[in-house]
UniProtKB/Swiss-Prot annotation:
Key words of the record: Cytoplasmic vesicle, Membrane, Phosphoprotein, Synapse, Transmembrane, Transmembrane helix, Transport
GO molecular function, one term: transmembrane transporter activity
Vesicular side: 109-122, 178-180, 231-238, 338-373, 423-425, 479-489
Protein name in the entry: Synaptic vesicle 2-related protein
Signal sequence coordinates: none
Cytoplasmic side stretches: 1-87, 144-156, 202-209, 260-316, 395-401, 447-457, 511-548
SUPFAM superfamilies xref list: MFS general substrate transporter (SSF103473)
Length: 548
């Protein structure tokens, strides 16, 4: 075996990293081609391609000038105790976000009856939350890119906690309208927890971990319904609002442990802070730090909207905006439709719908019954199989095909509701539809942080989240107002929107499956080191992979 070993001994030095990218010495950048002479090995070697994230053999290392990037360190340290703690902490933020969203479908019918609100005011109460989220999502993304992921997330959570508790003491409709809007403004920053979380995850674990963090969303929605079952009959909606803020309070107490992203620190020039964070992770995980010197990435302007519309990202950004719009439009529409359809009973009976319209026009109302809560709980439990299905297919089909499949299944279930079905079949169809639309949402949360570079990752996720809130803003007027006029038209709108979103998913120019996170907006996607042998020479080139 000893005679098979060989060494690289040709300058300029080619350093192989786990990211699959190449770094060349500045003396020979003009030629674009770098030869590596291999001593003692015959000519005619076949091309060898190093996969992204592949470990580099020690015999290829440069013993005199070892360097590494944050991506290398994260891959070397791996997944361990630190990431488990981070999962729980960011999961609390997600759980709180889910509870604040789920409470809308419970609070709306309650206030409709208690305060004798017309349908448009009930819809407005839901929409104002999404107005706040829409107006703040880009702002929180910009703050996270400019001042750090931890800073943006902490401020948004504390903001939501403060106004969430205040809204429980609202004396009249106008007060709760304003306060819930301010709650929505704070919730707009909670998705930045995904940005922070993703930047600490090794490549092989990233998709699975981001999907598993979505389990906390499912737990939040289920917990909110269970909480409502016990709290609403005895204590009322004000106590429900107060108790729903408990996960936010826990996050506020525990967030002192939360570190800043090492990727952000390097990009902003804080090399020492980044190294300290990486050493902390290595210590907690019981893994060694990479040897050598941490490379400081070229400092770039961060959080600039124009960077989302460079030729490389323009179509990705526009298509993602529509995908996120459709996800939220359909997901929250289904959440609101669930309570409306269960209260209506036979959704296929036109005469019953007319009676319901007449009743609602006279401001008659129905409180959610115990049966309504149980059916709501069953459909909410669909979040869990949604996570499991997405977890199983996302690394097999890829991110794009997973999103497309979820949209298609949701559309199919929506169309089946055109058939006259009983309550049990209605519950089953809503269960399947919600499982897959939540799965599509989860896949989008995996794809978006992966496709944007560190300099614009938070802003990219923030703008996508903002477009999602536009969809959520519109959906109450479809699910609660249009439903009174036509059940079929309402279902057709949701089904058609998701079919278009499925097409948009297929046309995304970049597939991020198996890719490392991009550090710089000046690097092309899919750069790989390829060793080519011809006539006794190995040639290493940096090739830009095509956009799939």
């Amino acid at each position: 075996m000893e005679e098979d070993l060989f060494q690289l001994r040709q300058l300029p030095v080619v350093k192989f990293r786990r990211t699959g990218e190449s770094a060349r010495s500045e003396d020979d950048t003009a030629s674009g081609e770098h030869e590596v002479q291999i001593e003692g090995v015959r000519a005619g070697l076949e091309a060898v391609e190093l996969d992204d994230g592949a470990a580099v053999p020690k015999e290829f290392a440069n013993p005199t000038d070892d360097t590494f990037m944050v991506e290398d360190a994260v891959e070397a340290i791996g997944f361990g105790k630190f990431q488990w703690k981070l999962s729980v902490l960011t999961g609390l933020a997600w759980m709180a976000d889910a509870m604040e969203m789920m409470i809308l479908s419970i609070l709306a019918p309650q206030l409709h009856c208690e305060w004798r609100l017309p349908s448009w005011q009930v819809a407005l109460l839901t929409s104002v939350v999404f107005v706040g989220m829409m107006s703040s999502s880009t702002l929180w993304g910009n703050i996270s890119d400019q001042y750090g992921r931890k800073t943006g997330l902490k401020i948004s959570v504390l903001w939501t906690l403060y106004y969430g508790i205040l809204s429980a003491f609202a004396p009249v409709y106008s007060w709760i309208l304003v306060l819930r809007g301010l709650v929505g403004f704070g919730i707009g920053g909670v998705p930045q927890s995904v940005t922070l979380y993703a930047e600490f995850l090794p490549m092989k674990a990233r998709a699975k971990c981001i999907l598993l963090i979505e389990v906390f969303w499912a737990i939040g929605t289920v917990f909110e319904v269970v909480l409502a079952v016990f709290v609403m009959p005895s204590l009322g909606w004000r106590w429900l609002l107060i108790l729903s803020a408990v996960p936010l309070l826990l996050f506020a107490v525990l967030c002192f442990w939360l570190p800043e992203s090492a990727r952000y620190d390097v990009l902003s020039g804080n090399q020492e802070k980044a190294i300290a964070t990486l050493k902390r992770i290595a210590t907690e995980n019981g893994a060694p730090m990479p040897l050598g010197k941490l490379i400081i990435s070229r400092q770039e302007d961060r959080g600039k909207m124009r960077d989302l519309f460079t030729p490389h990202f323009r179509w990705t950004t526009l298509l993602l905006w529509f995908i996120w719009f459709s996800n939220a439009f359909s997901y929250y529409g289904l959440v609101l439709l669930t309570t409306e359809l269960f209260q209506a009973g036979d959704v296929c009976s036109i005469s019953s719908r007319k009676k319901a319209v007449e009743a609602k026009c006279s401001l008659a109302c129905e409180y959610l019954s115990e049966e309504d809560y149980m059916d709501l709980l069953w459909t909410t439990l669909s979040e869990f199989p949604g996570v499991l299905v997405t977890l199983w297919i996302i690394d097999r089909l890829g991110r794009k095909k997973t999103m497309a499949l979820c949209f298609v299944v949701f559309s199919f279930c929506s169309l089946l509701l055109f058939i006259c079905v009983g309550r049990n079949m209605l519950t089953l169809l809503l269960f399947i539809a919600r499982a897959f639309i939540s799965g599509g949402f989860q896949a989008a949360y995996v794809y978006t942080p992966e496709v944007y570079p560190t300099a614009t990752r938070a802003l990219g996720l923030g703008t996508c989240s903002g477009m999602a809130r536009v969809g959520a803003l519109i959906t109450p007027f479809i699910a609660q107002v249009m439903l009174e006029s036509s059940v079929y038209l309402t279902l057709a709108v949701y089904s058609g929107c998701c079919l278009l979103a499925a097409l948009a998913s297929c046309f995304l120019p970049i597939e991020t499956k198996g890719r490392g996170l991009q550090e710089s907006s000046h690097r092309e996607w899919g750069q790989e080191m390829v060793g080519r042998g011809a006539h006794g020479t190995g040639v290493a080139r940096s090739n830009s992979g095509s956009q799939e």
